[in-house]
């Protein structure tokens, strides 16, 4: 089964955030390149842009939400795991139309696809704790 356009947008957003973290290139350049490089793929461009811009613009508050629930400094977290967590936390905070279970499940699936073997367990644990702070009403 093909991934939905929104799932593909999340996947590309994680890759773009990773690229931004590692390269320190301007976000606009990364965004333009990702859209151009993936022009033939079916994905939700607006959602991709929302996630990428949202993470890079709100990085301080996103990291503040993550820090209490990790057992090491953010700089010591694998770059892929960090990108996944940042996209998911932004989505939890700012995309309240998306159920938190969907956000966490998508992040787990991304970790299984792109990160180290047991990364999905780490991502799940951090997000499970973070969601209680961000969306206590759910």
UniProtKB/Swiss-Prot annotation:
Keywords: RNA-binding, Transcription, Transcription antitermination, Transcription regulation. InterPro entries: NusB-like_sf, NusB_fam, NusB_RsmB_TIM44. The lineage of its organism: Bacteria, Pseudomonadati, Pseudomonadota, Gammaproteobacteria, Alteromonadales. Belongs to the NusB family. This is Transcription antitermination protein NusB. GO terms for cellular component: cytosol. SUPFAM superfamilies: NusB-like (SSF48013). One of its GO terms (molecular function) is RNA binding. One of its GO terms (biological process) is transcription antitermination. Pfam families: NusB. It comes from the Bacteria. CDD domains: Terminator_NusB. NCBIfam families: nusB. Involved in transcription antitermination. Required for transcription of ribosomal RNA (rRNA) genes. Binds specifically to the boxA antiterminator sequence of the ribosomal RNA (rrn) operons.
């Amino acid at each position: 089964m093909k991934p939905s356009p929104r799932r593909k947008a999340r996947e590309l957003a994680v890759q773009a955030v990773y690229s931004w973290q590692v390269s320190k290139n301007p976000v606009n350049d990364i965004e333009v390149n990702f859209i151009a490089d993936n022009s033939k793929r079916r994905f939700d461009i607006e959602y991709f842009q929302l996630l990428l811009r949202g993470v890079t613009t709100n990085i301080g508050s996103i990291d503040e939400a993550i820090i209490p629930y990790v057992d090491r400094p953010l700089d010591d977290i694998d770059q892929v795991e960090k990108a996944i967590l940042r996209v998911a936390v932004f989505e939890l905070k700012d995309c309240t139309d998306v159920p938190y279970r969907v956000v966490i499940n998508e992040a787990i699936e991304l970790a299984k696809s792109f990160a180290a073997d047991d990364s999905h367990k780490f991502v799940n644990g951090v997000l499970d704790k973070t969601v209680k702070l961000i969306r206590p009403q759910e």
